C-alpha cells in the first residue's frame, strides 16, 4: 500500500474512476447521470486504493458533476447509474431544471469573461498606438534656384487651390454610470446594467442571493453578478 502512486489532482482522480468504473464514469464525451448517494459507494469500493482520501473523492465528484458534458447529460428521460452501470431510476424534473440553469450560468460566465478579455485587448492596442512625439527629422536644404536675369519675363505663379479646413467631429460623450453600493436596496424587476470591461449591458434583477445578484440580460441569458460589476 505504501508503494502505491498518489493521485494529485481531481482530473487524475476522475481518469482513475473512469478506468476503474467504465460503465459509470467517462473521461470524455457526454457523461451519464450518477446515482444519488454514489459518494458513499465510492468510499466503500475504493477505500485505500491509490491512497485516495474522502476529500479527494468529494472534490473529484464535484468537478465531474459540474462539468458541461455532465450537465448536458442531465436531461429528461435520462437514467441514473451506479458504479457498475446498473440503472437507478430516471431523473426528476427538478434535477433536470437545476442542471439546465447551472449550464446557462456557466456559459454566461464564460461569455462575460471573453467580453472582458476582448475589451482589455482593445484597450492595450489603443494604448500601444499612442506613441510619444517622434523627434523631428532634419530638413534637407532647399535647392537654390538661379536668379532671374534682368529683363527676362517673369512667369505667373500658379495659384494653389484653397483647402477647406476639415470640420472637427465632436467625440461622443461617455455615458456616466453610478455603481451599485448596496445590493439589498435592489428590487426584483429593477433595470440596471452589467459591466463587462468598458461596456455595460442592460439587465433586469431576477433575485438577490448571498453570492450576488441574479440578473437577466436582454438576450434572455441569466447569471449571478457581484455588486462591483453592477451599475445604474
Swiss-Prot record:
GO molecular function terms attached to this record: RNA strand annealing activity; RNA strand-exchange activity
UniProt cross-references to InterPro entries, sorted A to Z: ProQ (IPR023529), ProQ/FinO (IPR016103), ProQ/FinO_sf (IPR036442), ProQ_C (IPR035236)
GO biological process terms on file: post-transcriptional regulation of gene expression
CC per GO annotation: cytosol
Keywords noted in UniProt: Chaperone, Cytoplasm, RNA-binding
Comp. bias regions, Basic residues: 137-146
Disordered: annotated span: 105-182
Subcellular location: Cytoplasm
Cross-referenced SMART domains: ProQ
Classification via SUPFAM superfamilies: FinO-like
Chief site of localization: cytoplasm
Residue ranges with Basic and acidic residues bias: 117-136, 147-177
Pfam families named among the record's database cross-references: ProQ, ProQ_C
Gene3D superfamilies hit by this protein: ProQ/FinO domain (1.10.1710.10)
Disulfides per UniProt: none
Task of the protein: RNA chaperone with significant RNA binding, RNA strand exchange and RNA duplexing activities. May regulate ProP activity through an RNA-based, post-transcriptional mechanism.
HAMAP family tied to this protein: ProQ
Family to which this protein belongs: Belongs to the ProQ family.
PANTHER family from the UniProt entry: RNA CHAPERONE PROQ
Protein name (database record): RNA chaperone ProQ
UniProt organism field: Escherichia coli (strain 55989 / EAEC)
Organism placement in taxonomy: Bacteria, Pseudomonadati, Pseudomonadota, Gammaproteobacteria, Enterobacterales
